[in-house]
């Protein structure tokens, strides 16, 4: 039997189990072990993001704060059976409600706004998801974007590093991919810190009125929260940044083993109230998707994801509830019943709600 095939799962399980014991002992404060060099390596072209600071505890209400009357949704329509994106729909093909009250769609379009895409690349854990095939797929997907779109690169494990700021220059993207921090198998997958810092960076996107997308490249979908902002704070930051979270997971035997172990261990940790962050849940909540495929097929997978982003619809409305009271408003966007066929049901993926921002007062 190949010793390497045995040692990798054993190492992953050992590290995960040790992490669980450490996190449970620390109660609510998780301090990850340091990497070999103490922190993420500094970027040579762009400054490293400052370490995140813990924000005040947030209410438990599901919320996204909007300070303007116009509410904008970024929605994707898929065939339920095949997962294929559906294009060429009209405003009249949708029905929108807020807190159960039907709303009038006043703004509508498809593929009309530029994209701001942040590739968030995992550099920690037992397996390195960033292979030469993944590098090639990222570069090819960036080349398929439109001239007005922009791309940025960020890496994470115990810390986050902004490798390349938003750019439309292909040479800068290539340079960034060639200078990612090295993989550190002793470091963690600190999703809470990565999501929080990514959200803060997305607020400074060059396309403030465009569509903001975070594409996570990783081998796992859940991990314990590390020190810094909680997973809840990171989630809130993502929602308030207006970003859609997607994921690409290069599939392999080792990856399935590591991801399965982490799902099990974080599930056990949850019983002890040890906090964790989950990529699948955040993608679902923001209207994104997580795609998994073998490295040899990733060109096609990335192409599918970019195609899905291109066929998303921009839906805007002004709420019939004029109050600016900070209340949570639940949204539901569907296609009209006449378009639903028994053998070809359509589903809509979009964010689930927002908070009506309070009017600012001056003294």
What do these predicted regions represent?
Residues 1-13:
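Bacterial N-terminal signal peptides that target proteins for export
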Residues 10-22:
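Bacterial N-terminal signal peptides
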Residues 25-363:
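Scaffold/interface architecture of coatomer-like assemblies
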